[in-house]
Amino acid sequence: MTAIVDIIGREILDSRGNPTVEVDVVLEDGSVGRAAVPSGASTGAHEAVELRDGDKRRYLGKGVQKAVEAINDEIYEALSDMSVQDQVQIDQILIELDGTENKSRLGANAILGVSLACAKAAAISYDMPLYRYVGGTSARTLPVPMMNIVNGGVHADNPIDFQEFMIMPVGAPSFAEALRCGSEIFHTLKGELKKAGHNTNVGDEGGFAPNLPSADAALDFVMAAIGKAGYTAGEDVMLALDCAATEFFKDGKYVYEGENKSRSRSEQAKYLADLVARYPICSIEDGMSEDDMDGWKELTDLIGHKCQLVGDDLFVTNVTRLEDGIRNGRANSILIKVNQIGTLTETLAAVEMAYKAGYTAVMSHRSGETEDSTIADLAVATNCGQIKTGSLARSDRTAKYNQLLRIEQELDAQAKYAGRAALKALA
């Protein structure tokens, strides 16, 4: 009854209006699992390869027909009649079928779409929610949301060099209350920005993209909004940053074009340490460039005991890179992006490795998203305690928050909101 009878790939649009892959996996019992694949703007050099057509006459070269063809032909033939019960075997077949280290032949977008759709079809066939199917009976932790309310870097057309300024409602008693807190701060911030004469257009992830001169200026606005909304920064709400430092690391220096400043590796580490000392910042993602290994070690030694240091471009959800980071004392947390590695099995392996090493894990969206809410279920399935899925605007972001609300309601008394315990530096 759980045998795969059809796999249907198609080209759809993501939240930026670019093509992406969607996959339906149809089972013998009539169950259908559907998954849509996200896409990043600031991508790590070591990520699995997203296959694009490259035909400039169609979608400016960003079409994904080659990936769709691979799904409908080669991948379908390899998986047809298989049972979806064995996710590990399915993912191993997909990896071997591709035959490359970075999934560049079939495309990580094709492989991931099929991998996730198989898991969803299996969950439907067993009449189980996805978080329960993947995580078992222990899956009950609702994550603290990292809400990206000010956008900069490649996510926005403004002078701010850091990519994301986020709030984390760690003091809320439930996920629903955390979401309310974030929404109230988001709308208060909009009013404060308007009052100061800034535009309130939003970036790719739904956060505001004002013309502010520096990270300090952005943090000051966020701090003011937290207070005006009736919350206490450092108690009810903590701050988090995604520097996306790889994007402004040039010739061995961190070049802040918006501030007209350049910082050495040591100066970058000290600058971030100074921000942590002056603001209630509990998490910094990609504070150093993806290949600045000495910089990562210096930053971790400097503030790793009091701040979560998340490796995104550094680790790209890859167990080999994560293992190297753990062994050499770089970062203390990993960002989990399913499309960076390309299969559900490899994603879960990265989370497990992080846990065993005492690292935290943060489930994450990409800047190019869809209405697919799989990562909400995966955050609960893995009990990772943190999710990064954008602002309180744009339905591609709120789709994940709304799914978490449903899960919390469904779990009822079993639901546990991670709160401050999600961050080892605060626990």
From Swiss-Prot:
Primary location group: cytoplasm
Molecular function GO labels: magnesium ion binding; phosphopyruvate hydratase activity
CDD domains from the UniProt entry: enolase
Gene Ontology annotations for the cellular component aspect, listed alphabetically: cell surface; extracellular region; phosphopyruvate hydratase complex
E.C. numbers: 4.2.1.11
Signal peptide extent: none
Gene3D superfamilies (UniProt xref): Enolase-like C-terminal domain, Enolase-like, N-terminal domain
Cofactor note: Binds a second Mg(2+) ion via substrate during catalysis.
Pathway(s) the chain acts in: Carbohydrate degradation; glycolysis; pyruvate from D-glyceraldehyde 3-phosphate: step 4/5
SMART domains xrefs: Enolase_C (SM01192), Enolase_N (SM01193)
Top-rank taxon: Bacteria
Cofactor names: Mg(2+)
Listed InterPro entries: Enolase (IPR000941), Enolase-like_C_sf (IPR036849), Enolase-like_N (IPR029017), Enolase_C (IPR020810), Enolase_CS (IPR020809), Enolase_N (IPR020811)
Family in the record: Belongs to the enolase family.
Stated name of the protein: Enolase
Organism this protein belongs to: Bradyrhizobium sp. (strain ORS 278)
Gene name per UniProt: eno
